[in-house]
Each structure stands twice: as structure tokens, then as C-alpha cells.
Amino acid sequence: MTHIRAIYTDGACEGNPGPGGWGVVIYFTDGSVHELGGHHPATTNNRMELQAAIEALKAWRQLAPGSAIALYTDSEYVLRGITEWIHHWKRRGWKTAAKKPVLNQDLWQELDALNDPLVQWHHVRGHRGDVGNERCDLIARRLSRGQPIALRTLPPPLG
């Protein structure tokens, strides 16, 4: 049985705000790779980073539910948000320490609903040669510009 070895996520935005894209690369223990990506015509970089993480967790739940995964992001915003800040935001009724509404609350709530103790969140430094991060970055940047990119996908299940 094959398992997910690692998931990488990234988001990009041409201008901030502006057109954006997100990318997800899923590596399996058998060497196969599954990639996802999307575009939004008017967004921010942080929203695309969050969307990438959301789509990664949706894919994990579909492809390998119940298995532990390592999820890598170059976004400190996403990493600290989901592992540290979110607990405080929820306790304060989705307000920051300054009593202001949490930005991107809709996406944070969606990510929180998908998150699971089986997900191990990791930071990877962007643009440092990490193959998974570089591929996600390329997908996100291409899609933010509306440029085509061939995504590697798994064949549909038999039956």
C-alpha cells in the first residue's frame, strides 16, 4: 500500500492584491506525484497561501484519510496561524489581540475544520532549492499569471 510521504504548498500573487495562484505537490512513498493548482483573478498572497493549504488537506482526506502526513509550507503566516495563533483567535471570537477581526477569517475557519492531529506542519525556506517547494512555487506563479502548466496527476481509481 502506498502512502503520502510529503505534501508541499505555496501561493503567489501578481501584485498584492492582484491575480493569484496556488500550488500543491503530493509525494507518495511509491515515487508517484500528484499536483494541484488554481487561479483567482483578484486576491492576496496570504489568501493564496491559505488556499493551497486548504486544497492540500482536502486532497489528503481524499487520497489517504487516516494516515499521518508531513505538510511543508514556506509561509510563516500559515504555519504560525494554524499551529499558534488560531487557538487565541477562536478563544477571542475570531479577534486579534488588538481586538480587530482576523483577516481571512473565512479561509482560516475552513483550514481549521480540515486540520487534524495527524498533520505535522513544517516550515521550509522558500527559494532555497527544495524541489517540492520550488515546484509549488512554479505552479502558483504560472497560474497567478494565467499561464498554462502541465500538472502531474494520479490516474483515477479502477472500478
Curated annotation (Swiss-Prot):
Enzyme class, broadest EC rank: hydrolase
Organism taxonomic ancestry: Bacteria, Bacillati, Cyanobacteriota, Cyanophyceae, Acaryochloridales
Alphabetized InterPro entries for the sequence: RNase_H, RNaseH-like_sf, RNaseH_domain, RNaseH_sf, RNaseHI
EC number in record: 3.1.26.4
Ranges where the RNase H type-1 domain occurs: 1-145
Subunit and partners: Monomer.
GO cellular component, one term: cytoplasm
Name of the gene encoding the protein in the UniProt record: rnhA
Binding-site list for Mg(2+) 1: 10, 49, 74
GO term, biological process aspect, one: DNA replication, removal of RNA primer
Cofactor notes: Binds 1 Mg(2+) ion per subunit. May bind a second metal ion at a regulatory site, or after substrate binding.
Transmembrane segments: none
Protein name: Ribonuclease H
Gene3D superfamilies, sorted: Ribonuclease H-like superfamily/Ribonuclease H
Family designation: Belongs to the RNase H family.
Source organism (scientific name): Thermosynechococcus vestitus (strain NIES-2133 / IAM M-273 / BP-1)
Assigned keywords, A-Z: Cytoplasm, Endonuclease, Hydrolase, Magnesium, Metal-binding, Nuclease
Catalytic activity of the protein: Endonucleolytic cleavage to 5'-phosphomonoester
Function as written in the Swiss-Prot or TrEMBL entry: Endonuclease that specifically degrades the RNA of RNA-DNA hybrids.
Positions that bind Mg(2+) 2: 10, 137
